[in-house]
């Protein structure tokens, strides 16, 4: 009887802990969803994303905890009013976490994507030639390719958009960087646009690719449609950036 009571107590404790963790995850996701609730001078107020980060850190379930932190670090660094040094710290925290957790969850497309996205954001803060010489651009390319292989549709074709944008915008640097290709940009960005035409960045990059590859009539048509759209509430800042 005593053994049964102890077992029952342990079971109740285990269930309670799981319910608490699940509750924290749901709260964290809600705060993340509301990350654009207050916009000030073109940036999101950090209150909701700070709460999201705090709550994601309390979650036990994986890989949800890691994915939540990675996307929250990226949002806070990219879309709230923080210094460049704080941006670099947030991106670096995400890169380190993703590198660690990608070994634990090697087949998780979301972790692979946020690893590439945070690394790309960090690289935007340093000189492109320096990033290329140090192999950073090649590493980001490899991470994006891995994310595409695992889940090309994740985050509205996020990895396709990222890698396609790199092929389109990263310059060829003699003896250092020779792989950027308009042909690859065309292939990747067309696919991203087809998968998620509602994402303003997909539309913008697709139209830009059309312009660069001399399909100006089609490019103009896509651009004209884009600027008539309204930013989506949950993606307000990124949509606004490309719609304007």
Task: Enumerate the language-model features and the residues they cover.
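Short coil turns that delineate tetratricopeptide repeat
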Residues: 60, 105-107, 152-154, 197, ...
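Short, charge-rich amphipathic alpha-helical segments embedded
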Residues: 57-72, 79, 108-110
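Short coil/linker segments at helix-helix boundaries
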Residues: 30-54, 71-104, 114-146, 159-192, ...
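Alpha-helical protein-protein interaction modules
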Residues: 43, 185, 197-207, 212, ...
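Bacterial N-terminal signal peptides that target proteins for export
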Residues: 1-8
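Boundary at the C-terminal end of the N-terminal hydrophobic targeting segment
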Residues: 19-23
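TPR alpha-solenoid repeat register
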Residues: 65, 111, 156-159, 202, ...
């Amino acid at each position: 009887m005593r053994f049964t009571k102890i077992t029952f107590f342990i079971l109740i404790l285990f269930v309670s802990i799981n319910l608490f963790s699940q509750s924290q995850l749901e709260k964290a996701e809600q705060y993340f969803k509301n990350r654009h609730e207050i916009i000030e001078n073109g940036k999101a107020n950090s209150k909701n994303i700070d709460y999201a980060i705090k709550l994601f850190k309390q979650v036990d379930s994986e890989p949800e905890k890691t994915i939540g932190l990675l996307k929250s670090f990226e949002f806070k660094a990219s879309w709230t009013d923080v210094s460049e040094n704080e941006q670099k710290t947030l991106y670096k925290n995400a890169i380190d976490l993703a590198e660690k957790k990608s070994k634990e969850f090697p087949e998780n497309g979301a972790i692979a994507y946020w690893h590439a996205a945070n690394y790309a954001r960090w690289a935007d803060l340093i000189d492109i030639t320096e990033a290329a010489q140090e192999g950073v651009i090649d590493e980001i390319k490899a991470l994006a390719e891995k994310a595409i292989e695992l889940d090309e549709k994740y985050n509205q074709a996020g990895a396709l958009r990222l890698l396609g944008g790199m092929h389109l915008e990263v310059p060829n640097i003699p003896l250092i960087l020779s792989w950027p290709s308009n042909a690859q940009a065309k292939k990747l960005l067309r696919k991203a646009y087809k998968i998620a035409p509602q994402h303003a960045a997909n539309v913008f990059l697709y139209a830009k690719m059309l312009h660069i590859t001399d399909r100006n009539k089609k490019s103009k048509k896509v651009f004209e449609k884009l600027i008539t759209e309204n930013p989506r509430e949950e993606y307000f800042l990124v949509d606004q950036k490309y719609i304007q």
